[in-house]
A protein has these predicted regions:
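Basic, glycine/lysine-rich polyanion-binding surfaces/domains
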Residues: 1-206
Length: 206
């Protein structure tokens, strides 16, 4: 895989209703004690649309998206019509979100879903910690809550590092999402035992 030219952006949200505005959209809870957190924005069908970093500033909310695939500003503008807020968008330096950024993320075991095909991803398959199931309504909330409480999640998305150069023969129920350098991002059956991957497949979980 080659990392295509990313589209990193920053959006600043101003206005008295900025907290309520973003709280009703994101999967995480901006009312927590943290001044900085990660979250997803989902489709109504509960699939990942954006992964964002949220920073609470004195007079605004800073939203950072490492690779804006679906026009985050237009998405916010659609929901902002009835809110007392204003939006400002800035392009970020692409050099900070290229191959080195992506490789460092994989080494740390972090999957930046902004570089994956969003339309097929359930958020709980990747970073379940980006979802607060107690916070109340947000876009896609009914779907992800049903998956959680009825234990309907069947897959996990994990990072593995190749420990040899042997030809890789993955089982049929493994889905390769990304192969980058010596790293693979795989979607696997949830309860699969991967402790023997080193000897059987030459893969080590990151």
């Amino acid at each position: 895989m080659k990392i295509e030219t990313p589209n990193p952006i920053k959006i600043l949200i101003y206005g008295e209703e900025r907290i309520d505005f973003i709280q009703n959209i994101i999967t995480n809870d901006i009312l927590s004690e943290s001044k900085s957190l990660y979250s997803y924005i989902l489709t109504p069908q509960g699939k990942i649309l954006f992964e964002i970093q949220i920073n609470l500033m004195n007079d605004c909310i800073e939203i950072i998206c490492s690779n804006d695939q679906s026009d985050l500003l237009s998405y916010f503008e659609k929901y902002a019509k009835l809110s007392d807020i204003s939006l400002q968008k800035f392009q970020l330096d692409k050099a900070n979100f290229g191959e080195s950024y992506f490789l460092d993320s994989l080494k740390m075991g972090k999957i930046d879903t902004n570089f994956l095909p969003h339309s097929t991803l359930n958020p709980s398959e990747v970073h379940d910690e980006y979802i607060n199931y107690q916070k109340g309504c947000f876009v896609g909330q009914e779907v992800v809550s049903r998956i959680k409480h009825r234990q309907l999640q069947k897959k996990n998305i994990l990072i593995f590092e190749k420990i040899n150069q042997n030809t890789l023969n993955l089982p049929d129920d493994f889905e390769l999402l990304i192969e980058f350098k010596n790293f693979l991002v795989l979607r696997l059956p949830k309860n699969i035992e991967y402790l023997n991957f080193e000897s059987e497949l030459g893969l080590r979980k990151v």
